[in-house]
Amino acid sequence: MPIHILPPQLANQIAAGEVVERPASVVKELVENSLDAGATRVDIDIDKGGSKLIRIRDNGSGIPKDELALALSRHATSKVHSLDDLEAILSFGFRGEALASISSVARLTLTSKTAEQTEAWQAHAEGSQMDVSLMPAAHPQGSTIEVVDLFFNTPARRRFLKSDKTEFTHIDEWLKRIAIVRTDIHFSLTHNGKLVRQYRAANTDIQMQQRLSQICGRAFAEQAITLACEHDGLSLEGYIQSPHDNSVTDTNYFYVNGRLVRDKLVNHAVRQAFAEHQWHQQPSYVLKLTLDPHQVDVNVHPAKHEVRFHQSRYVHDFILQALQSALAQFPAKGSQAEYDFEQDNGSLEATAASNPDNGLSPSRGHAEEGDFSNSVAYAANAASVHRGSTSSERKASAGVSQFGRIPSSQGDYQPQDNSRYTPKRYSTNAASTNTASNYSHSTSAPVSRQALEGYAQLLATPEIVSSSNQYVADKNQEFKDVNESGSTPKVAAMPAVLAGQYWVITQGECLRLLPLQAVRLWLRQKEISHKLPTGLVSQPLLMPVAVKADKHWGEILLERESLLRQLGLELTIRYQQLIIKKVPPYLRESQLAVLIPELLQWVEHQVPAIPALSAWLAKHGQKHEQSLTDTWEGFCLLSEPEQQVLLEKAKVLPWQAWLEESQSE
């Protein structure tokens, strides 16, 4: 078959296959034309799901009489005149294919009147015929387009249409998406002569709240977080679902310069922002991104559903940072506890209270019999798994469950000085007797056989600290050996793990639960304290963070310049905003808009010591945790005083007293 040019009628019908997918596609194209014409009111009438009639009436600028026939021609548009216009598109339409494509598969009537004309004119075209007939008509300023018998000349396309209800649902859903971003427009939607939707123009905050409730639901409108962020030519505003709202909706609307798009980059940024809150479903959001039209290409999809950003990574990080700043006011769900080593042992009991699933009683920090038996059995299974698992399996099992956040009981930052701790010798009998006494008064039920078997399995765990002095002496000998031979010291076998949060350690006749998070925080603090004297490495942010600055912050930056440089921070004041350019790697994933102002207030009147600074960085720094094996190796390499401090944080379990009590009964 020779190559030839397609007839215009056939070319229009081929284009209609891309533009006109279903009645909702027709409504989209025609309503967008109305908005481009400056309309403030758009009325949509639908019959039989749009297959019989689609009528769009607006009060826009209208089309002059001598341009009506041209408007129904292919590639005829008033929105693009040059390549420069194509590279900076702000209108919805620009290809000039919609009316020609629709008229090739339906009977189309266009009636319009401009402000300068004394009368309206009507153009009619249908099917493959390209002839357009004109006649005078009665019509106010604006345009009305009627599309009758959609796909009347393409039976194959008509057979693929769904039921009238389904097709109207698609139209209704599309109208919601455009009504939420164009709040200045009055929309009405009727189906088979019945008014179904009416969105009045929203010019006040109350009216905007009402429209948001109409479209996204009352629960979302009442609990949504309002977002407004602007930086370096990018502007993001809208609403995101509150982490405290557990409802599941399909409200996922994202607009670029007013155009609704579906973009994986945006979905990734939203999910990453909500990751700290352990969001298990797609969060709901209505976000409007405004940027220079030269920085985005909208001419990449036939239906204009997708766009391409020239600086996609920059846009992604801007959206992520804006969402994280908005979510910073909400504590993360199930976030790791942040230990303060100056607090007493009650902090562990508070941790148990915040997480009842860990098997510890909120009031005493000890286990109830029925619940603790399950926890002990879990620990025994964990012990067997960790003895036989590989390193990668152990890393995968780290952080199975998490604490709830424990607020610090102290109002100011205090140095974490190890010298204030006096190592204590553990009196096993006294500790066991006292705890067993409290336990016997609080419970009366006997210990179950399952619990006794669990205790026996736990006691099969390798004894990590049978005697503190002997253990440290052996470890010191290992350090001596490594210094002499240069080989890695032998690390003791890792104990069992309870609920992914505690190590179960035997010490003489004591059974102790050592919090993993306390060890990880200590190791992180120790690492930072070794690096601080020479200064932390600075890492530039891909997108600097801007925070509204107080008047005296400029003086603080000058007075504490050397301290901030030591912390790896590069901060400047510009246009009454604090610009965060560089941060140490420990703070890169933190809420900088909250932490840096907090740091400036702290250092305003004092120069904190290195232990205090390292404690602050460790507490607020990176959230990803070390694997169990790496944490245990780090613990084994700690000095004796440091291990003693951590072991004092462990909770003693009076297993011997419980067994004696059970046997006596």
From Swiss-Prot:
Residues 348-370, 385-445 are annotated as: Disordered. Residues 348-361, 407-421 have a biased composition (Polar residues). GO terms for biological process: mismatch repair. Gene3D superfamilies: 3.30.230.10, Histidine kinase-like ATPase, C-terminal domain, MutL, C-terminal domain, dimerisation subdomain, MutL, C-terminal domain, regulatory subdomain. InterPro entries: DNA_mismatch_repair_CS, DNA_mismatch_repair_MutL, DNA_mismatch_S5_2-like, HATPase_C_sf, MutL/Mlh/PMS, MutL/Mlh/Pms-like, MutL_C, MutL_C_dimsub. Residues 426-445 have a biased composition (Low complexity). Disulfide bonds: none annotated. SUPFAM superfamilies: ATPase domain of HSP90 chaperone/DNA topoisomerase II/histidine kinase, DNA mismatch repair protein MutL, Ribosomal protein S5 domain 2-like. One of its GO terms (cellular component) is mismatch repair complex. One of its GO terms (molecular function) is ATP binding. It comes from the Bacteria. Keywords: DNA damage, DNA repair. It holds the Pfam family MutL_C. PANTHER family: DNA MISMATCH REPAIR PROTEIN MLH, PMS, MUTL, DNA MISMATCH REPAIR PROTEIN MLH1. This protein is involved in the repair of mismatches in DNA. It is required for dam-dependent methyl-directed DNA mismatch repair. May act as a 'molecular matchmaker', a protein that promotes the formation of a stable complex between two or more DNA-binding proteins in an ATP-dependent manner without itself being part of a final effector complex. Belongs to the DNA mismatch repair MutL/HexB family. This is DNA mismatch repair protein MutL. The lineage of its organism: Bacteria, Pseudomonadati, Pseudomonadota, Gammaproteobacteria, Alteromonadales.
